[in-house]
A protein has these predicted regions:
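Sec/Tat signal peptide C-region and signal peptidase I cleavage site
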Residues: 20-29
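N-terminal, post-signal-peptide region of Sec/Tat-exported proteins
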Residues: 48-87
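Surface-exposed, short loops/turns at beta-strand junctions within beta-sandwich domains
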Residues: 97-102, 239-243
Length: 308
């Protein structure tokens, strides 16, 4: 088919998608980093460039850039500052100077606070973007019954200069973390790879794990694997194809029990609906009950799977 006809077909498909967008259910955006390389010779003077973004499809940035602060861990475990960092409208990019032989970890760790407080008889939500450092300023004077939960997100990718090493995988004991059984820069299609996930330093059992291959624009549908961690927090993934794979696991979220002796189903803030007047506990005009939030922890990594 001539290039002009292909371009016309693509534009027609995009226009049709835009027309149907209001009635479509949009997939949740994914946070990711994409390295320019995952393996280096190890000359002692090499450069790694990383893109960081939030998008619906991997790895095509289509959401506003986030206020992330990436860092790198060198093979000896020391923290390395990223260089040449720049933020655009849709992505953040930065460089890592690869000097030491071994495996580097590039990470973005973010904390936010969700919750609510009672003020003048009305329960109000904490503003979006609240962090542990700004929580005190986010709660107005006179507020009582403050409910809050710290949500932690960890995004990682890896690169190895020369032979792979494992010092950078020493867990911090905080949040969701990955400790590899199979080294993440030694992956091949058709081969099994095992990773262990820890929650606050302990095996994270029975958590759902998703592995998604990038390049969906050039594939007939999303290539996604859905698995579950075992009692030791381990999961084994057999990669069906080569590519840059995004692996994600999450825990928590929703809301806790409604009160002492009672329970309420987990629900997001969007799902909360006010009760009809007269049916409010405590009489008409009483504040609608909102259960305390539960901390949400998430982990995602981008790994390269080579052809076997």
């Amino acid at each position: 088919m001539p290039v002009k006809m292909i371009r016309t077909s693509i534009l027609s498909a995009l226009a049709m998608g835009a027309a149907l967008a209001p009635i479509a259910v949009e997939a949740a955006p994914r946070s990711w980093m994409l390295p320019s390389e995952t393996m280096f010779v190890g000359s002692g003077d090499e450069w790694l460039t990383v893109d960081a973004a939030l998008s619906t499809d991997l790895y095509y940035f289509d959401h506003a850039v986030q206020n992330w602060e990436p860092f790198a861990l060198a093979p000896d475990g020391s923290k390395v500052a990223v260089e040449n960092s720049a933020k655009g409208r849709l992505r953040q990019t930065f460089d890592v100077h690869v000097v030491q032989p071994g495996t580097y970890k590039i990470a973005i760790v973010s904390e936010s606070v969700s919750g609510s407080y009672l003020l003048n008889g009305e329960r109000k939500m904490l503003p979006r973007g609240t962090t542990p450092a700004t929580l005190a300023q986010a709660v107005p004077a006179g507020a009582t019954d403050v409910w809050s939960a710290v949500n932690t997100s960890r995004i990682e990718t890896f690169a190895t200069a020369g032979e792979p090493t494992t010092a950078v995988f020493k867990p911090t004991g905080k949040g969701l973390e990955m400790v590899p059984v199979t080294h993440p820069t030694e992956l091949a299609s058709g081969e099994a790879a095992t990773f262990q996930f820890l929650l606050d330093g302990k095996p994270a059992a029975d958590l759902s794990v998703s592995a998604v291959n990038g390049g969906v624009r050039y594939r007939d549908g999303i290539q996604q694997l859905d698995l579950t961690t075992d009692a030791e927090g381990k999961v084994t993934i057999t990669w069906p194809d080569a590519g840059m794979w995004w692996v994600n696991v999450a825990s928590g979220g929703g809301r806790s029990a409604a009160g002492p002796g009672g329970s309420a189903p987990q629900a997001s803030a969007k799902a909360e609906q006010p009760l009809a007047a007269g049916n409010l506990p405590g009489g008409e005009g009483a504040p609608r009950p909102i259960a305390p939030p539960r901390p949400r922890l998430s982990y995602s990594m981008t790994v390269e799977v080579l052809p076997s």
